[in-house]
Structures are given as structure tokens and as C-alpha cells.
Swiss-Prot record:
CDD domains from the UniProt entry: RNAP_beta'_C, RNAP_beta'_N
GO terms of molecular function: DNA binding; DNA-directed RNA polymerase activity; magnesium ion binding; zinc ion binding
Species the sequence originates in: Actinobacillus pleuropneumoniae serotype 7 (strain AP76)
Cofactor note: Binds 1 Mg(2+) ion per subunit. Binds 2 Zn(2+) ions per subunit.
EC id: 2.7.7.6
Amino acids binding Zn(2+) 2: 815, 889, 896, 899
Protein name per Swiss-Prot or TrEMBL: DNA-directed RNA polymerase subunit beta'
Lineage: Bacteria, Pseudomonadati, Pseudomonadota, Gammaproteobacteria, Pasteurellales
Gene this protein is translated from: rpoC
Function: DNA-dependent RNA polymerase catalyzes the transcription of DNA into RNA using the four ribonucleoside triphosphates as substrates.
Cofactor(s) this protein cannot do without: Mg(2+); Zn(2+)
This protein's UniProt keywords: DNA-directed RNA polymerase, Magnesium, Metal-binding, Nucleotidyltransferase, Transcription, Transferase, Zinc
GO terms under biological process: DNA-templated transcription
Sequence similarity: Belongs to the RNA polymerase beta' chain family.
Catalysed transformations (reactions): RNA(n) + a ribonucleoside 5'-triphosphate = RNA(n+1) + diphosphate
Signal sequence annotation: none
Amino acid sequence: MKDLVKFLKAQSKSNDDFDVIKIGLASPDKIRSWSFGEVKKPETINYRTFKPERDGLFCARIFGPVKDYECLCGKYKRLKHRGVICEKCGVEVTQTKVRRDRMGHIELACPVAHIWFLKSLPSRIGLILDMPLRDIERVLYFESYVVTEPGMTDLEKNQLLTEEQFLDAEERWGDEFEAKMGAEGIQALLRDMDLEHQCEMMREELQETNSETKRKKITKRLKLLEAFQQSGNKPEWMVMTVLPVLPPDLRPLVPLDGGRFATSDLNDLYRRVINRNNRLKRLLDLVAPDIIVRNEKRMLQESVDALLDNGRRGRAITGSNKRPLKSLADMIKGKQGRFRQNLLGKRVDYSGRSVITVGPYLHLHQCGLPKKMALELFRPFIYSKLESRGIASTIKAAKKMVEREEPIVWDILAEVIREHPILLNRAPTLHRLGIQAFEPILIEGKAIQLHPLVCAAFNADFDGDQMAVHVPLTLEAQLEARALMMSTNNVLSPASGDPIIVPSQDVVLGLYYMTREKVNAKGEGMYFLDPREAEKAYRTGQAELHARVKVRITEHVKNEAGELVAETKLLDTTIGRAILWMIAPKGMPFKVFNQTLGKKAISKLINESYRRLGLKESVILADQIMYTGFAYAARSGASVGIDDMVIPAQKHEIIRAAEAEVAEIQEQFNSGLVTAGERYNKVIDIWAAANERVAKAMMENLSTEEVINREGNPEKQASFNSIFMMADSGARGSAAQIRQLAGMRGLMARPDGSIIETPITANFREGLNVLQYFISTHGARKGLADTALKTANSGYLTRRLVDVAQDLVITEDDCGTHEGIVMTPLIEGGDVKEALRDRVLGRVVAEDVLKPGTEEVLIPRNTLIDEKWCDVIDAESVDVIKVRSVVTCNTDFGVCAKCYGRDLARGHLINQGEAVGVIAAQSIGEPGTQLTMRTFHIGGAASAAAKESSIQVKNAGTIKLTNAKFVTNKEGKIVLTSRNTELTVIDTFGRTKENYKVPYGAVLSKNDGAEVAVGEVVANWDPHTMPVISEVSGRIQFSDIVDGLTVTRQTDELTGLSSIVVQDVGERATAGKDLRPALRLVDAQGNDILIPSTDVAAQYFLPGKAIVTLDDGAEIEVGEALARIPQESVGTKDITGGLPRVADLFEARKPKEPAILAEISGIVSFGKETKGKRRLVITPAEGEAFEEMIPKWRQLNVFEGEMVQRGDVISDGAETPHDILRLRGVHAVTDYIVNEVQEVYRLQGVKINDKHIEVIVRQMLRKAVITNAYDSEFLEGEQVEVSRVKIANRKRAEEGKPLVEFERELLGITKASLATESFISAASFQETTRVLTEAAVAGKRDELRGLKENVIVGRLIPAGTGFAYHQNRAKKRNQPEQAGAFEAPVAKANGFATDADIEAEFEFVADDATQSLAALLNAGDEE
């Protein structure tokens, strides 16, 4: 025991306990201190003896012995000589392991610039010397001199001299000045830098300068100089005089058979450096001519460059096989580099993989493990059991027994496996449910058996998928596997909070079949005592499964006290439903079972069960449902036959009619009445409509059949057609697929997404002819190619998301903020996209919710809204709630539980230590592969939607108009004169039911506050033109409307009416450039009429292309159109859909033609125009007017004299999230990104909780730009973490200083990942070289806060069960004096601890970990 304790003690000491990792530049002395000797020769090993050469790259004297405890010449062998240095060969006798960590060094004959600091942009050496990179390179590669000491001459320091200039200068001044070339020159300049003085100068310059670019440049340089000052790095260390040599076992040389060697590329690169270095030393000793020495120096510089980062400068050095050699930089970067290959992902022992097959008889927490695999995986456990039982005397004997597979071994295996969970994993692991724990059941055969209900989580199917098995070894690991990862503990999806253990396919079909009802089935109208009797009747053939009968049902209902009370009723049901009720757990209502169960209904049922009865019952129910479903699916005998695809009789008639219509359109086109585009669109519309009609006829035909009921009358019932049942239940197939089988295939898309106008009129049952087949392959092949590309893109998006969010963990319970985001139901047009209850479920209320219309508190602040509260919200018809959100959370590092709300996968408030960032990233990334790359415009749907021209109300209620300005015309109708008007319909409870955008110039039949009935049309407008509405009555007076200059006259050939068309500025003659055509309204005397309630004259400027049909001097009434502006057809813009759109949003990319937003609130006017742009002026109520130049071709949404609010959209186009953040703030940008991302996912029918997107948005917003720094540690214009500014501001507030002012900045996820505080995390993500260079120069410290950093240094992550471990370490760090007191008693009088003390200490450590785990596990049960 003593030895063991000593051994443990020694082991635990070796693990240096560190809290921070610092990276910096290595000084030459530092490199020499690491080194165990200088490498002088380029030789590696002797080709005959295979012994390393002395002083060579593998020298045993420098790096350590080749064999354990044995010197090279063999004089000293074995352990007793440990630590002796052999006098003959100079090798220390020790473990050969030291060859992995002992470094050597090379003394360079001349200094060499480090390529990372030279060439990694922006060049650090260039920045600190304030010289362009080109000049530095010319000095380094010996093309020109640089002045290092100007002396009393007219040369400047840092000035470059060519060879001639240098010689001239030397003649003039002799040795008064000093100029050098090569790295010596650069090193001298760096050594002479006075950092403090430079910083002072830069600061002064910053104060004086006004130019933006200069400020930026100075700030950059100042930051670098300050970093050097603070980190203690010296600038001259960026030029190396000593080169470290990697330990030899990290760049091995392996003899192959046949006398050849396989070697690491690094050895080649080192050999080159040493050869050139030695040659240079010799040349310097011989005092060779300058030009030769220079060439050698340049070659040395190049070879060192290649060793550090091959291919960064010039051509990469290649090996014998023409492939570039792998340098030190290549070793760490990229997917195969050190970070991603060996530190973030490791291969593990105790694992195996095999094909999976279905295990329909398993319980949810079990999986079938082949005996062969189990034997191999649990080997050590079996050995120890065999030995401890005394069955085998030694481990060796045990091994023999296992290899012979003796019968006793199988018994022991069964014992070992019992209750030892194993992990199953299916690649690709897109979310955390891709690895789950199961209890193994030993089976014959070689395939793993998987429970069918977990397939959805793994996204597995049994067409040859493989899965990997891992064995958790330690007790803690087994505990975690059982408590956190067991498949029974993962019933709900972390992405949406819905059950993920949901039956699919066969099971659904079986349940659907057994709960259907049939008219006049055998046994209809019978009465049964209980479900058991009903089942008996079915089994004995006295009644059919679908017969409508009456059965006595006993339900268990909760009473006031919350106890279950039995209630028995006689209910109408069917035999199948009664049988299904037998597996229902107590406390479920019968009405959930007493219906035809499709996939949705079953999912609801499991969800209901989980919320009512908890985990255990739900899991048992799911299992029972599965067994029943399989059994009855087999009974149903549903199959697919060709006769099940019934083609509707009306099909030919419908197609004939459509063909006739198309012919007519073609006729019109030939006679020039419609354009080619119109013809194409109309043809597609006709065929799309025909397809719909055929499909409708087909579905009516398939879905119902007429039967004779008991009274002898015909009655319609849902049909028992197999194909229809499969689609209707949601087991397999969809209406769209049946349409292709039995209706018509319809319109096909080309690979670019455009629609081929000839449809395929045949269906698959009739068969396609060659042409039709060819057309359909066209778009289908694109689909297959897309899928392959999609997967890679989706994986990359997930990786970026994980990287940006990885360090977000729940770190405290409540940050105490009162901020939050305001939630309302999502309404688009006439339908509720998402009800309020779905949006606030699982959130915490930020402010008391009042009962509508009263001051009474309905839901107090800080309440977690669960299903019960949702019902209250519905009942009281609340339609706006302020909930807490991750984006507004005040916690410095991490998020608080209250702001996050419910843990979706567990159903209670989230625990501390939960890694919400990673969960969010996985939830968004996992469905990524399902998102189509491009949204195919389904026949004509895209063009139809854009051309709305009226609003028809779907619900009765009251109309409410927002942002509305209008005039009333002579018919008493209202004509809108405002831009972004919204029309909402509100029901009697004050809930918003519908929400529409109404365009300018629309005619409304109802005013604000009017009542409407269902189906009423409340607004009309012309979708093709935009009118200019007169706001007063009067006579028209033309202004600047000159024929031939600003306008042209057109006469319609058919009607003979003439109209005036305004020309674009670009098309006018020079004389007309400055004229601004307008219509003024005057009274009979010719005076301007003022617009009511303003002092602005009524005159309307006409944009280009506007058409005026009225004449000068015509009378016009208020609300009439003065002119019309034709609208380019909207909706032809191809919207990027699917994955690329999501990526664009998270990368915060600026759209090509972003919308222009109003920078301030005020009145719009237009100033003087220039050639291609017009000047937009916004004049606020007080303060400066704001001017902006806008290109002519942009369509503006505002008229002169209109009032705009800050952040309003002025011109069409997509909004930039950066603008939204700047002008409308954090809430608006969160809203924007969340809604836009959800839009994409909703189209695909994927449900993701808003929380996850908010988490990513929080990470995108974690940087701020300092706008006013006062006397703080920040610089103006510097980008800093928001949390750092907040911490600084809290301190300043206590000291009574003014707070640092800052603006939040939105970064795309890639940028945000690279801008993280942790350089380890950033380096392992992308652009490794750049990140490490920057970090080293700045002497950055990594606090190891995130998950990635801790994985890389090999620690427990500060999340989940590792959260407590990190908290304890933090506590100990913050209270060193108490820690000392705690450790004092262990040291006894004699200064040594007893074994018992040490044992106790070790026990404490183990307990600590288990306690924290126990605490975490209990947190889930307290609810």
C-alpha cells in the first residue's frame, strides 16, 4: 500500500496545476535554456549500425538514449545505473521517453527573420518599424541597405540605399554613418526601438490627426507597441539568432525493409538549415568575398523560412517526389494538423463497430450486442473476474481461457455485462443524441441490434448503416452514461422540446389501422363489459377490429387533492381502440386514444404522457405502443399493389381543357397581344391549376368510398386503400407522391430552378414515354448532385456555429436583469404562423404580466412559463409578454439560468453548467442537411404570391391601422398616402388575428376601428403601378414639364388617348438635366394650395418613367391619382433559400443591394441631383440635417415632405443586420435574425426553438467598439469584449468616473470565432498561423474559460459534470489562505505525512467529484 501511495503521490505531482496559458516570443537565451546541446552536423543515423551519429539530428548525447536505461556504447545497462552519464559516449542512462521532450538548438551564423512575423499579414515587423513590407524584404533578401545609424549625415534612419547610393554615401561620409543589409540590419533597427518614446509619439499624433485612415493606422501600431511593452517581449526577438530543434521522437526516422528509410519531412528541412549554416560559418572564417557570403546568408534565410512555414514565401521546397515538404506550421494547422487531429479528436480504446439491424423485441434502454464483440470489449473485466474467483491462477491463464472461449467464460461475460451501460454512436454525430447509452443484451450473430424508436435520434436506418460501440470504464463514466446519456433519459429533443422517441413507419401504420372505424363491420353495436372482453370478441372472430361498439372504460382522473380517482363510463369507441386502451398508463384520458391515430396524434400522445405522468411511464408507454403497432401492422396486411393507384376518370377531360387554354394563349402571343414572359407565366399557371384539379379528383377518389350502413343507406367512409392509409397515417409517402403515381407528374424544374413549360401529363402507373422520362431526369440529377454538396456545407456551418458558441455555459442562477424581449404571436397575412403560447413556453417572464384591461398581476416576474401557464395565457387572451432572453442577459462570462429558461430536453429550469452554446449550435446545424440548397419555385406559386391586389379578411373583428396617413375621396372611400401602413384585425378579446402590409395608394373600404365580417374585402390596389395621390382638390399646373426635354408624349394606338411619360435624368438632353418635372395644385386664382395642417405647398415631383394622363389645367378631386409609376414586377428576384441563406444570416453578410435606412428621424426632402445620384435630405425637428447620396436606379419608398423615423426603410432591397443594429438596437437585430432564420427552417417543416438562435446572436454581439474611452485602459475605435467594458464600467461607477461609451458590433460567426479572447480556441478553428502570430506578439494569456481550450489541454470541460470541478478550483484559487489552513494538519511534526493522511486526502478528491455529480443528477429530480 505504501508504495502505491508513493507512486500516486509522484504521479499527481507531475501534473503541473496551471490556470492560464501564456504565449510569447522566445528569446535566444530561453531557447538555449530549453536545449540539451547544439546540433552541429546534418547527419542522422549511421546506415550500417543504425546508431545515431554524434552531434547529428538524432544524437543520443543531446536527446537521450535510444534504448531504455542503456547508453549507446553499451557500457552501462539496466536500472541500477540510472542517471549516470557514460564517459565514453556521453549518453545519460535514463528512459528513452526523454527523446520525446528534450530539445536541441542550432546557433545560426547570422540572424534570420522569423517568417511568421514578417509575412503573416499585417506584417508585425513592418508595423513596428513603420516600413512597408516590400522594403523590409529587399533588405532581408540582400537587395538594398538600410541605414541603422545616420550619425552626422543627411541620411534618415530606416532609409533604404541601393548598392550605388551606399557606395556614394561611403565616399562622401566615410564611416560617419552605419548601414546594413540582411536580417542584421532589421535586427539592429528593432533593437534600437525605444518603445515608450514611440508610444508617446503615437499618442500625440492621435490627438492631432483628423484623417480617419491615419487614425486607424496609428491605433493599430499603437496597440502593437503597447502589447510589446506589456508582455515583456522584445521586438528584436522577431529576428532569430538561435533555432530550436524539435525532439527526435517527434520527427522519427523509421527503417523500412530493403535498407530504405521513411522519414519525417522536418528532418530534410533541418538538414538543409544545418548544411547552409555550417557552410556560412566556413565562408565567414575564410573571409570569402561579400557576394558569396551574401548569397549563402540569403539561402540560410530561405531554408529557415521553409522549416518554419514552407511555401509562405516563394516556391515551396519540395522533396524527392515533387511534393512540398511539410513544415512546422503545416504540422499544427488544418484538419490533419495537431489541433484538430490529435487534440480535439482522439481515437479511443475499448471500442468496436458493426452493422445494425432492427431489434423490435428490445426495451427502450437495451441494445443487442454480439457475443463476439462483447468478449473483446470487456476482456480486462473478464480477466479480473476469472482471477478473483480463483478460476484462473494468473492473468496469462485467464487470457488463454478467453482465447479458447471456454463455457465458463460466457457465464462470466454475462455477469460482467450486467448493468454495465455501453455507448452507441452513429456517424455523423450531428447533435448530442448521436451518442446514447444502452444496456447490452448478448445476442448471437455479428450485427448490433438497435431499438426502432431511437432511430429518429440517430437518424439511422437498417439499409447497411454501421454503428460504433464504446465502453465507459470508470465508475464516474458509467454513472454519467446511466444518469445522463441513457436512451430512456433522452425522450425530448433538445432542439424543440418535442418528443424525439416517436414511432414511425410500420408502428404508425399498425396503430392507425387498429384505431380506424368501419361502417357496418361485423359486431357493430355490441356492448362490452371492459376492453378485455372486447379483445376476446375480436380474437374469437365475433367482431372485427374496426367495429363501432360501446365499451365500459375506466379512466383515472386527478381530483382537487391531486390523487388519481377511477371513473367508469360506457363510451362509443371501436374494438381496436379499446384494445389499445389496455396499454394506457393510469392518469391518461381516454379521449387521446379514442380517435384515429396518425403520426401527429401519436407524437402528441407521448408528449401529453410525458408532461402528465413523467419519464418512466412515458418510456413504458412508448415501448408498449411500439410492440402493439408492430403486431397490428402485421395483422393489417397492408401492401402496395398496382391496383391501389386509382386514376381518376376526370383526368383526360381536365388535361384536354388545359391544352385548349394553352393553345388560346399561344394564339394571343402569335398575334402580339401578350409578351413572351406573360405567355410563359400564364401557361405555367394553367398547368399548375390543372395538376391541382387532377390531384384533387384523385385524392377524393382514393380517400373515401361509399358503403351501405346498417340501415341500408349509402354512407361515405374513409377508404381502406393501402396507399392512402400509408400516406394518411404519416407512415410513408405523401399526397404529392401519390399524385405522381396516380394523378399526373406535372411540371418539372430545370437544374437552375426554372420550370419547363411542357408538363408530364402521364403518371407512373400509366408509364412515361421517352421524352417525358428525359424531361424528368433533367431536374432529378441536379437533386442528387446537390445532396452531395449539401452535406459538406452543412457540416461546415455546424462547425462554425459550435466554434462561436462553445464557451457559452450556464454559470449562475440569476443575473437580476429586468431587460428582455417582447414576444407577440407571429402573424403573417391572415394566418397565425406561431401562437404566443408556443413562443413563450419555457421562458421566464421579465416583468409582471397584467390581466388585459386591469392592473391585476396575472403572472409574476421571474416565473417560468410551463404548459399550465400557457393555458392561462390562452384563457385570458394575453397577446404580449416580455420574457427574459439570452441576448439581454447580464452575466459576464456565460449566461444565467433565468435568462435561458427551460432545458428543452428535460422540461425543467436549466441546470448550472449546461453547455447551452454547443446545444444551440447542434440544434441549428443538425437539420442543415435537410434544408434544400435552393428553393425550387413550385409551378407559378412564386409569381402568383407577389401579385396580391386586395385584402380579404379571414376573421371577424375590428380593424386597426398603424402608421396610416390618408385622404377621403369623393366616394367617401379612404385612400392611403403613407408608406409602411399595417392593417391588423383584432378579435373581441383584443387579440391580433391577422396582420397585412398595405401599399401606398390603396383604397380602403373600412376605416380605423371599423367592424368587419368574415370574408370582407377591406382594401384594393393596382399591383402593377404605383399612383401619385393628390392630397387636395384643385387645378393642375405643370412645372418643368417640357416636351422633348423632360417628358415624351405617347399615343396609344388602340384607344387614341395620349399620355405624358417622364424621362429618366440619364436619358435627358443637357438642357433638361436640372429641370425637375412636377405637378402643382393651384386654386382658381393660380395660387398654391397648401396641404391640410401643414405649410407645405401641394406639389408632387415626378420620378422617371412616371405616366401622366391629365392635361395642364385639369380639375382634380382629393384622393385621385395624378400620375402612375409602373412597377417592375416584384417576385422575380431569386431569393436564396435554404442553407446558404442561414449561413448568410449568421455570417452577417451585407446583401448586394442593401436597403437604405433613415439615419435620423425627420422630414424627407430632395436636394440638388448629380449625374447618377440624387441627394436625399432628412431634416429633424432640431439639430443638423442629414444628407445622403442615393443612386438614381434605386426605387425609393418615400416622397418629398414625408416624415420618417430613424431606422425606417427608405429604398427597396434587403436590410443589412449591421444597419439594423446601429439604428434600431440589439432587440431589433435579434428579432430580425431569429425571424429570418426561422423562416427558412419553417419552410422545411423543421421546428427549432428561438432560444438557440438567440444564443448564437448573443455570441455575434459579444464585441463592442469604444466610442469614448476617457482615461480607461481602452483606445478609441478599439474592438473589445462587451463583458470587459461592463466590468470596467462597474469599477468606474464605484470610483465616480465617467463611464466608457461604446457601440455594440455585430460580427459574423467566423469573425466572432477568430476574435474570441482565447487564442487556443481561435487557433484550432481557422487561420492558425495568423492567430498564433498575433497572440505571440501580444503575449496573450488564455484563461481556459471555454470548452475547447480545456479539451485541448486535456482537462475536464467547465460544463456538465466538470462544472463543479472548475468551480472548486476557482474557489481554492480565490481563498489561498484558507487552503493553506486546510492542508496544515497533514504535515506531522517530523515533516512527513502518514500513509493514512495521504489516503484520506485522496479519498476526499474522489468524493468531491462524485458529490458534484450527484448534485447535478439530483437537480433534475427536484422539480
